[in-house]
Regions:
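Short, well-structured N-terminal submotif of metal-dependent ribonuclease cores
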Residues: 1-39, 46-66
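Acidic, PIN/NYN-like endoribonuclease modules and their adjacent C-terminal/linker elements
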Residues: 2, 109, 113-116, 127-159
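Conserved glycosyltransferase catalytic-site signature
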Residues: 7, 41, 120-124
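A generic structural signal for short hydrophobic patches within well-formed alpha-helices
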Residues: 10, 44-47, 76, 144-145
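A general structural signal for well-ordered alpha-helical segments in protein cores
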Residues: 44, 54-57, 76-77, 123
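Acidic, metal-associated active-site segment
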Residues: 46, 96-107, 119-136
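Short, hinge-like loop/turn segments at secondary-structure boundaries
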Residues: 54-58, 87, 154-158
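Acidic catalytic patch
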Residues: 66-115
Length: 159
């Protein structure tokens, strides 16, 4: 089994998030025993901001048995296709990253509907990479992933 890890799971542990750190550590420990843990280059880049050097980040990855696996053309093309669909269909609604529920926000002054891109292409690259190069993805961003990558198995905590 190959398990991909999203940045938020690793940041929970690195930044010691009191709400999610234990669940995230348990997820990583559980799936590490089932097979290979991997991250894509975007997760690597996002994690690098938390380390004094690339050498320190690489040591962390070795110590946690996490392997950097680069995206292939299939993953990158899929991320672009899903991003295009997301951009076209998102209209004026926001989406909760946890439950996937959509809602609108209006300006308190002029009552105009506020539009905002909640997800950038990197979120799509991480998910497409996981879909094409692993069995499942560890992430707390399940609402977004369910809406845009229904074909991807996502675990945010042990059930």
């Amino acid at each position: 089994m190959i398990t991909s890890i999203d940045t938020n799971i690793l940041l929970d542990i690195l930044l010691v998030d009191n709400k999610f750190a234990l669940d995230s550590k348990n997820l990583i420990d559980f799936y590490n025993q089932k097979g290979q843990l991997i991250i894509c280059e975007l997760v690597y880049a996002e994690l690098s901001s938390q380390f004094p050097s690339g050498k320190e980040l690489n040591k962390f990855l070795i110590d946690t048995s996490i392997k950097l696996v680069y995206s292939n053309e299939k993953s990158l093309a899929l991320s672009g296709e899903r991003w295009k669909k997301y951009s076209r269909n998102r209209k004026s609604t926001h989406q909760c990253h946890s439950c996937g529920k959509k809602f609108s926000i209006h300006c308190p002054h002029c009552k105009h509907t506020v539009r905002m891109r909640q997800h950038i292409i990197s979120d799509f690259i991480i998910a497409a990479h996981a879909l094409n190069q692993s069995t499942l993805l560890l992430s707390r961003d399940r609402g977004f992933l369910k809406a845009n990558f229904a074909d991807l198995e996502v675990k945010g905590k042990l059930s």
